Regions:
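N-terminal intrinsically disordered/low-complexity leader segments
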Residues: 1-9, 209-229
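Helix-turn-helix
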Residues: 2, 13, 21-55, 59, ...
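An amphipathic alpha-helix adjacent to DNA-recognition modules
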Residues: 8-16, 49-77, 124-128
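Short, amphipathic alpha-helical "lid/cap" segments that border enzyme active or binding sites
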Residues: 15, 85-92, 189-197, 201
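Hydrophobic/aromatic residues within well-ordered alpha-helical segments
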Residues: 53, 60, 64, 88, ...
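Hydrophobic alpha-helical connector segments
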Residues: 73-107, 155-159
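Hydrophobic/aromatic-rich alpha-helical bundle segments in the mid-to-C-terminal region
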Residues: 107, 111, 123-132, 141-197, ...
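Short helix-capping/turn signature of helix-turn-helix
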Residues: 113-119
Length: 229
């Protein structure tokens, strides 16, 4: 029984250490030796408990993002009958809370950005477990706000614009940009949520007249009509 408890503890330490090392270095540059050293485990521990570094990486993904879903659900606890505006604000706040979390969960945002910048075989797992649920939710919200005549590219552009405003805070594991470090984090989070929400709704309102005025335009073209004349 004691041996089993020790094994579970070692596995837990490896997952915690791997989350930090993968977040800081990415999958390719992180070494099994470094992870084992950080976990204070022997060099064979990863193969024993997970089978390989790749399988450990997959477990880190599953654990981190299940934790994110449990702690900060994308729907913010709202019912399905909530307005599109309310669902948008809840989703923005959920993403910001995940990115600005100063606990070990904050490493999850860094891992996402590392994976998107330097894709590995795990990218499919990222798409399935992290990106796809967010994409479906944000596209549904945006389409409801822009209107049924919107081309798919317009929905995609708006959704990406909103999401990346939130992801930009995920680079430093919960640490704020230097110019914002003196501010109370919870107060700032509320203000950021409101700002990104209002900024995004304003952008969608600016796109909506183009959608309604030019239903015949090829997909995506009307987004750029104002710039190119």
């Amino acid at each position: 029984m004691a041996e089993r408890r020790d094994g579970l503890a070692t596995k837990s330490h490896l997952l915690a250490a791997a989350r930090r090392v993968f977040a800081e270095k990415g999958y390719r540059d992180a070494t099994s030796g470094e992870i084992c050293s950080a976990a204070r485990a022997n060099a064979a521990s990863i193969n024993y408990h997970f089978g390989s570094k790749e399988k450990l990486y997959a477990e880190v993904w599953k654990e981190a993002f299940q934790e994110a879903i449990d702690r900060y659900p994308l729907d913010g606890g709202l019912g399905a009958d909530a307005s599109a505006e309310a669902r948008l604000k809840a989703t923005v706040q959920s993403l910001l809370r995940r990115m600005l979390d100063s606990s070990s969960l904050g490493y999850a945002g860094q891992i996402v950005l590392m994976e998107l910048a330097n894709p590995t075989e795990a990218l499919e797992l990222v798409k399935q477990d992290v990106i796809e649920p967010l994409r479906r939710r944000m596209h549904a919200i945006v389409r409801e706000l822009v209107g049924p005549k919107a081309a798919e590219e317009q929905v995609v552009f708006c959704a990406i614009s909103i999401i990346h405003q939130c992801l930009g805070f995920g680079f430093k594991k919960g640490k704020l940009p230097a110019m914002l470090e003196s501010l109370d984090k919870e107060t700032l989070l509320v203000s950021l949520t409101e700002h990104i929400y209002r900024f995004s709704v304003g952008g969608i309102r600016a796109v909506r007249p183009q959608v309604n005025a030019a239903p015949h335009v090829r997909s995506g073209e009307c987004v750029f009509r104002a710039e190119v004349g």
